[in-house]
Amino acid sequence: MNIQLLQVFLTTAREGSISKAALTLNYAQSNVTNKIQQLENDLQTKLFYRHSRGITLTPPGQILVSYSEKILHTIEEARAAMGESSAPSGPLRIGSMETTAAVWLPQLLAHYNNLYPNVDLNLVTGPTEQQIQAVLHYELNGAFISGPIEHPDLVQEKVLDEEMVLVTSASHPVISSIQDVQTQTMLVFRKGCSYRAKLNHILQEEGLLPIKLMEFGILEAIIGCVSAGLGISLLPRSIIASHEKEGRIRSHTISDKYSFVSTMFIRRKDTLITPALSAFLTHMRDHFQIKRPDQS
């Protein structure tokens, strides 16, 4: 099976469009179409449905996506192993929730980057579910997510615990009970965010659903709109502490049974521990004072 054909197929499947895949690969659209047809002929099956809105994967195509990811990842690992030296170098892609990246990672990443300048370190931010899928599909070497989670293909290490608080404008009255938010507009991240899932769990437990939600893409927008009195939000205390100190917003504690969430670092069990990743894991454990998984 031709590796280039698999790369073209997987890119097309991820982009969901031949034209977008062509742009990503810097190919002509006709070249992408021809390579997909060649792969379909080799496998004697249709991999995509063609329709007026574009393309979608057939059942055999969905199966091939998983195999293609594994094959291409194994080839990348083999190349890395062949060129490997004891000094950390090469690409390292780490994912993180936006809030974790903003508060907890700057010093860690800066120190790591100074120690290992030959590592091509790349940080990708996004909600927890997006990070999990990226790790599972070999797009990231590891990621900081909200957890814990259970998945047979993942290894996880607890990094820290975060206290969650309700956040309002500075002039907002004290919130003494979660019931007080029933008439408020809740400002949340897009679906897939663990803090939004946490809020939904709390509201469901307290019998407060449905409630009005307003969705935002970035943290700064939520904090700005909370400060202006547009609504309230549920966020880690660490991320809003400086804004509260400036008098822009006000935090309100919630019940202990809801108030803490754990940040975990996940990676695939079968991922190759390159010198770059090994050094990152060691540096991360030292930074957050984490015991190795094999230590008691």
Swiss-Prot record:
UniProt keyword terms in alphabetical order: Activator, Amino-acid biosynthesis, DNA-binding, Glutamate biosynthesis, Repressor, Transcription, Transcription regulation
SUPFAM superfamilies: Periplasmic binding protein-like II, Winged helix' DNA-binding domain
PROSITE patterns listed in its UniProt record: HTH_LYSR
InterPro entries noted in UniProt: LysR_subst-bd, Tscrpt_reg_HTH_LysR, WH-like_DNA-bd_sf, WH_DNA-bd_sf
Protein's UniProt keywords contain Transmembrane: no
DNA-binding region, residue intervals: 18-37
Disruption phenotype: No effect observed.
One GO term (biological process): glutamate biosynthetic process
Gene Ontology molecular function: DNA-binding transcription factor activity; transcription cis-regulatory region binding
Coiled coil regions in record: none
Residue stretches making up the HTH lysR-type domain: 1-58
Physiological role: Positive regulator of glutamate biosynthesis (gltAB genes). Negatively regulates its own expression.
Homology family: Belongs to the LysR transcriptional regulatory family.
Protein name: HTH-type transcriptional regulator GltR
Gene: gltR
